[in-house]
Design a protein with these regions (language model features):
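Glycine-rich Rossmann NAD(P)(H)-binding loop
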Residues: 216-221, 246-254, 264-268, 276, ...
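Glycine/proline-rich active-site loop of Rossmann-fold NAD(P)-dependent oxidoreductases
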Residues: 199-206, 237-246, 269-271
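NAD(P)H-binding glycine-rich loop region in Rossmannoid oxidoreductase-like domains
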Residues: 78-82, 87-142, 146-149, 164
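Terminal hydrophobic/aromatic helix or amphipathic segment near a protein terminus
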Residues: 258-307
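N-terminal Rossmann NAD(P)H-binding glycine-rich loop of SDR-like oxidoreductase domains
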Residues: 46-68
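Substrate-positioning beta->alpha
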Residues: 139, 217-239, 244
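Amphipathic terminal alpha-helices
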Residues: 305-334
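Glycine-/Pro-rich loop/turn segments that contact NAD(P) or position catalytic residues
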Residues: 123-209
Length: 334
C-alpha cells in the first residue's frame, strides 16, 4: 500500500487529498482545502435550493469560489449547463439533487450530510397552477422541515426588502409567513433582503427595446438594485456571520426615470416614456384578477413597491449600465 498526496485543480479551488493506492485508487479522503480565501480545515457542505434561478446560479458559483461543497436542487437538471436568460452562469455543482419542493416525497433525502441550507425558492413564471402559498411558503417549509430533521447548522433565506410595507399582498405574505417559521425553527438563520435584482430591471430594457417605457407614478421613486454576483457574495458571507437579517442593495441609487433613460441610452434610442397614474394601474390589477390571480398579485406588488423608495446599504461593484450593455448583442431577456 502506497500513500501519496495529490493536488487537484478545480476552477479557483485546490483540493488537497490523500489517496491510498494499490495500483489504482481505492479510497479518496479529503484532508484539507486551500482557496483564495484561505485554509478551510473541513469543507462545509451547502444545499442551494433555487439553483436554476437568477440568484441561485450566482450563489453556486460564489460558493465554489469560496471553497464549499455544493448540492444543487433542480426541478429540471437540463437547465444547469445553460447560460441563463439574464446572463447568469451555468451551474457547476458537486452534486445535483432532482426534486420538487412542492412534492415532499421527492426531496426526503435533500439535506442528508448538509451543513448549510440556502433557499431563494420563489414562484416566478411556472405554468403549473401553483400559488405563492404553494411555493414561497409551503415549498420552503418543506425544505425547512427536512433541514431540521437533518440537524442542518444554519438556514439562509432570501425574502423581500421592506416586507412590512407589503404584507397585505399574498406574494409578500407567503415569504414572511415562512420567515416566521424559520425564526421559530430553532435553527441558526439569516434572512437576506435585497432591494431588487438586475434581472428585474431587464423589464425596463425590454420596454426600451420595443420603443416605449411605461413608468408607474411620477418616476421619482428610488431604488439601488443589485447584481446577482454581488448579492451572492452577501449570501455566502452570511454563512460565517451572526446577523439574523441583512438588507442589501447595489452601489448606485436610481429613480425609475433614470433607469428608463439609462436603458434608452445604452440602446442609443430616443427616450419615450409614458407615466401611468397609480389609480389606473390599480384598475388594471382589478381587471386582471378574475382571469389570473397570480399575475394580478404580481402587478399589485410592483404597483405598491413602485410608489415608495427601496434603498438599502450599498454593496458590490457591478453597475446597471454595465449589465444593460451585456444585454445589447441580441441577448434574449425574457
Amino acid at each position: 500500500v502506497i500513500c501519496k498526496v495529490y493536488t487537484i485543480q478545480w476552477d479557483s479551488v485546490n483540493y488537497i487529498s490523500l489517496a491510498t493506492l494499490t495500483g489504482r485508487v481505492v479510497s479518496f479522503t479529503r484532508v484539507s482545502q486551500y482557496t483564495k480565501h484561505g485554509v478551510i480545515d473541513k469543507m462545509q457542505r451547502v444545499l442551494v435550493a433555487g439553483a436554476t434561478g437568477y440568484l441561485g446560479r450566482f450563489v453556486v458559483k460564489e460558493l465554489k469560489e469560496q471553497g464549499y461543497w455544493v448540492r444543487a436542487l433542480a426541478r429540471n437538471p437540463e437547465k444547469l449547463n445553460r447560460l441563463g436568460v439574464f446572463r447568469e452562469p451555468p451551474i457547476i455543482a458537486d452534486e445535483v439533487f432532482v426534486g420538487e419542493v412542492t412534492k415532499p416525497a421527492s426531496i426526503q433525502r435533500l439535506c442528508d450530510n448538509i451543513d448549510i441550507a440556502f433557499s431563494s425558492i420563489g414562484l416566478t413564471r411556472q405554468k403549473d397552477k401553483l400559488t405563492y402559498r404553494d411555493v414561497d411558503y409551503q415549498g420552503n417549509k418543506n425544505i425547512l422541515d427536512i433541514a431540521v430533521e437533518s440537524s442542518v447548522k444554519k438556514f439562509i433565506y432570501v425574502s423581500v426588502f421592506n416586507a412590512h410595507l407589503y404584507e397585505h399582498l399574498e406574494i409578500v405574505k407567503a415569504h414572511e409567513d415562512f420567515v416566521r417559521e424559520l425564526q421559530n425553527s430553532g435553527l441558526n438563520y439569516t434572512i437576506i433582503r435585497p432591494t431588487g435584482y438586475f434581472s428585474d430591471m431587464s423589464e425596463f430594457f425590454n420596454m426600451a427595446k420595443s420603443g416605449w417605457v411605461f413608468l408607474l407614478g411620477n418616476g421619482k421613486s428610488q431604488i439601488n438594485p443589485i447584481h446577482g454576483a454581488d448579492l451572492a457574495r452577501v449570501c455566502v458571507n452570511a454563512i460565517t456571520r451572526d446577523d439574523n437579517e441583512v438588507s442589501a442593495g447595489g452601489p448606485i441609487t436610481y429613480t425609475g426615470q433614470e433607469i428608463a433613460e439609462l436603458a434608452f441610452a445604452i440602446l442609443t434610442k430616443t427616450p419615450r416614456i409614458i407615466r401611468i397614474p397609480s389609480w389606473l394601474a390599480q384598475a388594471a390589477v382589478k381587471a386582471v384578477r378574475p382571469f389570473n390571480k397570480q399575475t394580478s398579485d404580481l402587478i399589485d406588488f410592483f404597483v405598491a413597491a413602485g410608489q415608495g423608495d427601496a434603498v438599502a446599504p450599498k454593496t458590490g461593484v457591478n453597475t446597471l449600465a454595465d449589465y444593460y450593455q451585456e444585454l445589447v448583442p441580441g441577448i434574449r431577456t425574457r
